[in-house]
């Protein structure tokens, strides 16, 4: 199989090829440099990453020109800023990590760009803007900014704007704090572009982008007695078109769809999505691997996708009793769950994403492998984010994992997989076949090569 047909929706088969890689080649990677979130903006011209050191790096797409015809999927650093700093909660004697958990872009309204970034406790709204002119010729200041003696000023000057080198500024416009007792795992901007939600383990809050000192609690699953706690919220997202509808997933593998029109506190769901468990396959690990790590609405709003430890499921919003599609991501790991439990990998939170036309989906795996599934043809492919195939326009070879004793030449044995190399965060350009894949401290960008 050559590839998974994607973004353009034209159904042509194509191959994925290497575009670029950002990040250091070091063997010893500093914890702070590990990428923790990746997100394209609405146009796909900007790509933001957050890391465990609290930094946000924004990449801007290069304009394709005649001298460089293959720069279509090339992104270069546009702005870097420190979004969050480590803090200490003295009341609870807890360290608050600076790690960026999520980044969400706001739709562009003017020349500036806005994004939300969050760590475990605090959400910030950032404005990213450009300056290429500066004012000169002030009356009370000289060109170096020093104050002039008013008694020596003999003529009145009108300040003028002079061109300067382009400068990109990132400034915090709002800080939304003190609303979450537990760790924030999700933020999602509403389709009304005025409100957004933030979710932690037990509660979901609704915020207005202009108001920082109060939020509305719309879901609260905290029991009166914490010993009765049986599940936690793992992810939440607003519907892309209906501003009153949102979903949240749980550690029990269920998804609840809520309608804010029915009541202010959405503790009663409108729809409850759950797949009945097969009793014959129940094991000690069943509950752990059924925990949902990510939920994403399709662009059309008709479907939603959930990721658990071993699979990706696509649900039709009109059918609650089972998913319409199930894709096995790395079924060969089912026999390895015991060792994955011992090394804590079983608790890894893999994300998933749709392509622009909702015809294909992508999610990560171990050994720096990532998987793509074509929903129309039901074909799938395993690719690897590796510097070994990082020549410009180098075509990615499909990878295969074997579980038996005999291994073919181009296959890798399941026992040889490196579980320290994992692709948790991926993003797909909203309109084209350009993908971003975070592998530890490196950001890989791949694009299609149509056959």
From Swiss-Prot:
Keyword Cell cycle tagged: yes
Keywords, ordered alphabetically: Cell cycle, Cell division, Cytoplasm, Mitosis, Repeat, WD repeat
SUPFAM superfamilies: WD40 repeat-like
UniProt xrefs under PROSITE patterns: PR55_1 (PS01024), PR55_2 (PS01025)
One Gene Ontology cellular component: cytosol
Localization annotation: Cytoplasm
GO molecular function: enzyme-substrate adaptor activity; protein phosphatase regulator activity
GO biological process, one term: cell division
SMART domains: WD40 (SM00320)
Chief place where the protein resides: cytoplasm
WD repeat start and end residues: 30-69, 95-136, 179-217, 228-268, 287-325, 342-383, 418-451
Assembly information from the UniProt record: PP2A consists of a common heterodimeric core enzyme, composed of a 36 kDa catalytic subunit (subunit C) and a 65 kDa constant regulatory subunit (PR65 or subunit A), that associates with a variety of regulatory subunits.
Role played: Substrate-recognition subunit of protein phosphatase 2A (PP2A) that plays a key role in cell cycle by controlling mitosis entry and exit. The activity of PP2A complexes containing PPP2R2D (PR55-delta) fluctuate during the cell cycle: the activity is high in interphase and low in mitosis.
UniProt family annotation: Belongs to the phosphatase 2A regulatory subunit B family.
PANTHER family: PROTEIN PHOSPHATASE PP2A REGULATORY SUBUNIT B (PTHR11871)
UniProt name for this protein: Serine/threonine-protein phosphatase 2A 55 kDa regulatory subunit B delta isoform
Organism: Gallus gallus (Chicken)
Gene behind this protein: PPP2R2D
């Amino acid at each position: 199989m050559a590839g998974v047909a994607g973004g353009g929706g034209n159904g042509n088969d194509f191959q994925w090829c290497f575009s670029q890689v950002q990040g250091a080649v070091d063997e010893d990677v500093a914890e702070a440099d590990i990428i923790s979130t990746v997100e394209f903006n609405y146009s796909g011209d900007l790509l933001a990453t957050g890391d465990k050191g609290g930094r946000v790096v924004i990449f801007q797409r290069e304009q394709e020109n005649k001298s460089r015809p293959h720069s279509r999927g090339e992104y270069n650093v546009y702005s870097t800023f420190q979004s969050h700093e480590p803090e200490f909660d003295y009341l609870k004697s807890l360290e608050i990590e600076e790690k960026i958990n999520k980044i969400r872009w706001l739709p562009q309204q003017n020349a500036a760009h806005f994004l939300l970034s969050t760590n475990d406790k605090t959400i910030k709204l950032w404005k990213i803007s450009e300056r290429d002119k500066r004012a000169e010729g002030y009356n009370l200041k000289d060109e170096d900014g020093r104050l002039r003696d008013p008694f020596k000023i003999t003529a009145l000057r009108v300040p003028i704007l002079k061109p300067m080198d382009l400068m990109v500024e990132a400034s915090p416009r709002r800080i939304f704090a003190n609303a979450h007792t537990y760790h924030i795992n999700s933020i999602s901007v509403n389709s009304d572009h005025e409100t957004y939600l933030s979710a932690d383990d037990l509660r979901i809050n609704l915020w207005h982008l202009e108001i920082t000192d109060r939020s509305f609690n719309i879901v609260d699953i905290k029991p009166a007695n914490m010993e009765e706690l049986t599940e936690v919220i793992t992810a939440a997202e607003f519907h892309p078109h209906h501003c009153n509808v949102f979903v949240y997933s749980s550690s029990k593998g269920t998804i609840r769809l809520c309608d804010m029109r029915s009541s202010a506190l959405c503790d009663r769901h409108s729809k409850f999505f759950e797949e009945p468990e097969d009793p014959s396959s129940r094991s000690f690990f069943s509950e752990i691997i059924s925990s949902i790590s990510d939920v994403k609405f399709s662009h059309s709003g008709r479907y939603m996708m959930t990721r658990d430890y071993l699979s990706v499921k696509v649900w039709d919003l009109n059918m609650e009793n089972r998913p319409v599609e199930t894709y096995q991501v790395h079924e060969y790991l089912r026999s390895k769950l015991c060792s994955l439990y011992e090394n804590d990998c079983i608790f890894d939170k893999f994300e998933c994403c749709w392509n622009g036309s909702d015809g294909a989906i992508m999610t990560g795996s171990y050994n720096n492998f990532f998987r793509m599934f074509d929903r129309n043809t039901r074909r799938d492919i395993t690719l690897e984010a590796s510097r070994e195939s990082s020549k410009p326009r180098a075509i990615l070879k499909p990878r295969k994992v074997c579980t038996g004793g005999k291994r073919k030449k181009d296959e890798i044995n399941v026992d040889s997989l490196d579980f320290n190399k994992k692709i948790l965060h991926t993003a797909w350009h909203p309109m084209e076949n350009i993908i971003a894949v975070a592998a530890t401290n490196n950001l890989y960008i791949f694009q299609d090569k149509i056959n």
